[in-house]
Amino acid sequence: MERIVVTLGERSYPITIASGLFNEPASFLPLKSGEQVMLVTNETLAPLYLDKVRGVLEQAGVNVDSVILPDGEQYKSLAVLDTVFTALLQKPHGRDTTLVALGGGVVGDLTGFAAASYQRGVRFIQVPTTLLSQVDSSVGGKTAVNHPLGKNMIGAFYQPASVVVDLDCLKTLPPRELASGLAEVIKYGIILDGAFFNWLEEHLDALLRLDGPAMAYCIRRCCELKAEVVAADERETGLRALLNLGHTFGHAIEAEMGYGNWLHGEAVAAGMVMAARTSERLGQFSSAETQRIITLLKRAGLPVNGPREMSAQAYLPHMLRDKKVLAGEMRLILPLAIGKSEVRSGVSHELVLNAIADCQSA
């Protein structure tokens, strides 16, 4: 069992990583006997895990209600968020309730925002079931829903009480979702840890076949890196922005193509190549290092080009609504070397458009 602490003073919390955690009531601390829980999951995961998690919580004396949401990025919306509020109020659940997010990034982000908003804030626990949510979205307290004009535009910073990562969930993950998660894994190597990127080049095949020790190390290292960044910059005023490598471009793809048509990790993968090409055009990143990124992403089964039907010009309106924009100016996350990156302002739109065009499918 691996245990990592996100250090945020009184709001510090543990990330527990192991197989078989859904069989252990202690996995869901700080829940105690007699407490009330609203378990939030989706229609795909409910048949797989809802009864198991409900059973282990009830075994610990916890009173469990549940709400099952539709599955898909297109349902990460204010309308679906309202169904969670309605379920909470119908019971009713008070300020002493705990929301448990059992699912991937959509369930986790939406449930976290519900917890931040319901009666001005109730406790919640992240139980991520996808690789992407285990290594990234469940850690750090970013909660949100989408708006038709932009991804994650309505939300709050709100930290969970704990994160429970059961590696056994990956056994039911579709290959496309596994690849999507690997995009965020590869991101950590590019922005923060060149040695980890080297390790990924050597061990990617093991991750693709869900090798237990390799996957446990991979998730642990990603969570360590994210925990360090969040502890240093919880509200993304500086260092934490680096975690958005590829996201400014990627969010544009997701919004323009319709939420759910490109998985988040797929869009981020293409976006990371666009960021690398931008950095190349600025003369601060080598084409050889861009090729290393492209090769690793392709091996993971990820796209390295934007959608054929999306012109370079179509990216700009979305990118100018990005949450990192200050005073109307884009701030891009750009690699300087494998393992080192920067936040860069003042890049001309023409250069960015040319970098996007470099990455468009033929």
Swiss-Prot record:
Q: Cytoplasm: is it a keyword of this entry? A: yes
Q: Which CDD domains match?
A: DHQS
Quote the InterPro entries the UniProt record gives. Dehydroquinate_synthase (IPR050071), DHQ_synth_AroB (IPR016037), DHQ_synth_fam (IPR030963), DHQS/DOIS_N (IPR030960), DHQS_C (IPR056179)
What Enzyme Commission number does this protein have? 4.2.3.4
The main location class comes to cytoplasm
Family recorded in the similarity comment: Belongs to the sugar phosphate cyclases superfamily. Dehydroquinate synthase family.
Its protein name is 3-dehydroquinate synthase
Q: Please tell me the species this chain comes from.
A: Shigella dysenteriae serotype 1 (strain Sd197)
